[in-house]
Regions:
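Glycine- and aromatic-enriched mobile tails/lids
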Residues: 40, 350, 369-449
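A glycine-rich dinucleotide-binding beta-alpha-beta segment and adjacent secondary-structure elements
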Residues: 287-353, 360-362, 378-397, 402-409, ...
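Helical element adjacent to the flavin cofactor pocket in flavoenzyme catalytic cores
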Residues: 103-122
Length: 449
């Protein structure tokens, strides 16, 4: 256990997913933490509460299936006692094979625990630079304040990179016309009770929807340069941007109908809009994949063209915001320490990962290694064959070029250590082999901790 005193051993800047996870990994090992969070004193433009670990973009934490990259990463993080994932499972809402949470209950539980812990000194203030002494974990996230970004850019001598992100609307369940919708999971059994509300559309309805979507007025963003499409992270592309790439783009994206049969017709719909439960009560649903930057009045007008949503009551409308991150390969080691300042760590989305689970993983590793330094132990690096190790390798790989580096989700393309596929070998068998190797390597890693 770390030496106990009245002063924090580590300063964590930011109480998002990464900052909270880092803090937990420290305090569970007896290390005292000063946790700084600027909200609500300094708003971000995207967050709506003063709660820690607020989920802004979506309430889905990704796939829960063990043969999916996100599922494998969750398995690894739970083996390392991830606090964020423990709370996520506690406040889980039905979402098929995905892990989705009641975001308010989730954030309230985390805020209560962190602010009430004897080893956490919480400070509600903006950090504009690192403290002069002590170990620091930067976990300010993609909505880092301009003043902190300016200090980071000056300190690290590397320009920040940026991309734009978008948020999907949320509506009340009772306002959905269930005579025009059905409950089911994609490829679900007819006897199975589904988790998603599915809003089918025929060809004429879909084409009119796309026409109106493309014609709708968008919110003007002065920062949205002419080549900004390159800066849009693919996992959170605004629905209007997807539609602009082709008339059927939405049917092969968030509105794909495969795996569904409309019970009214007995046939597959032309397109389907999915609604996912957003809270434990089941009174709120979000529109899956419908991140948007349309003007608010236009969102209501266009989205009500979906037959089941003709009377939709929206509790939150979509918006776009700028997400910033650092070119971490220039200055981060695989332990998430700054190369010439081993007492500084960078974690979460600001270091170049994308996704809730991925951010949590970076926070976990930073917190674990900061704790090990406090305990006079060497920092560790997860094996590159594992999903966590593969993400770490991505954000610290020195071969990256600045303009080619962009936020990365967990995916099997990142994994190393598998043998070359034999002729005729399927993608499924290669993935299965990669999972076996990832589990073997990660088990050995944990055994050495």
């Amino acid at each position: 256990v770390a030496r106990k005193n009245d002063h924090p051993n580590v300063t964590v800047i930011g109480a998002g997913l990464a900052g909270v996870e880092a803090t937990f990994q420290l305090i569970r090992r007896g290390v005292r933490v000063k946790l700084l969070e600027m909200r609500p004193k300094v708003p971000t433009g995207a967050h709506g509460t003063d709660l820690f670990a607020e989920l802004v973009c979506s309430n889905s934490v990704g796939s829960n299936l063990p043969d999916r990259a996100s599922g494998l990463l969750k398995e690894e993080l739970r083996a390392l006692s991830s606090y964020i994932l423990d709370v996520a499972y506690k406040y889980r809402v039905p979402a098929g094979n995905a892990l989705a949470v009641d975001r308010e209950a989730f954030a309230r539980e985390i805020t209560r625990y962190m602010t009430g812990h004897s080893h956490v000194e919480f400070v509600n203030d903006e950090a504009t630079e690192f403290p002069e002494e002590g170990i620091v974990i930067l976990a300010t996230g993609p909505l880092t304040s301009p003043r902190m970004l300016a200090w980071l850019s000056k300190t690290f001598g590397a320009d920040k990179l940026a991309f734009f992100d978008a948020i999907a609307p949320v509506l009340t369940a009772e306002s959905v016309d269930m005579t025009q919708a059905f409950v089911a999971n994609r490829y679900g059994d007819a006897e199975e009770k589904g988790d998603y509300i599915n809003c089918p559309m025929n060809k004429a309805e879909y084409e009119e929807f796309v026409t109106q979507l493309l014609a709708a007025e968008r919110i003007h963003l002065p920062e949205f340069e002419k080549d900004a499409r390159k800066q849009l992270f693919s996992g959170c592309q605004p629905v209007e941007e997807i539609a602009s790439s082709g008339k059927d783009a939405l049917r092969f994206g968030p509105m794909k109908p495969v795996g569904f049969t409309d019970p009214r017709t007995g046939r597959r719909p032309w397109a389907v809009v999915q609604l996912r439960q957003d809270n434990l009560l089941g009174s709120l649903y979000n529109i899956v994949g419908f991140q948007t930057n349309l003007k608010h009045g236009e969102q209501e007008r266009v989205f009500r063209l979906i037959p089941a949503l003709k009377n939709a009551v929206f509790t939150r409308l979509g918006q776009m915001h700028r997400n910033s991150y650092l070119f971490s390969p220039a200055f981060l080691t695989p332990t998430l320490q700054v190369k010439d300042r081993p007492d500084w760590f960078v974690a979460g989305q600001i270091c170049g990962v994308e996704g809730y689970t991925e951010s949590t993983g970076m926070g976990l590793l930073a917190g674990l290694n900061a704790a090990r330094i406090c305990l006079k132990k060497p920092p560790v690096v997860p094996p590159p064959q594992s999903m966590l190790g593969a993400l770490v390798k991505y954000v610290t790989f020195e071969g990256h070029k600045v303009k080619e580096f962009s936020p990365m989700n967990a995916n099997f393309g990142l994994l190393t250590g598998t043998t070359a596929p034999a002729k005729g070998e399927s993608a499924e068998s290669r993935r299965a082999a990669a999972i076996v190797e990832a589990r073997r390597a990660f088990k050995a890693f944990i055994a050495e901790l």
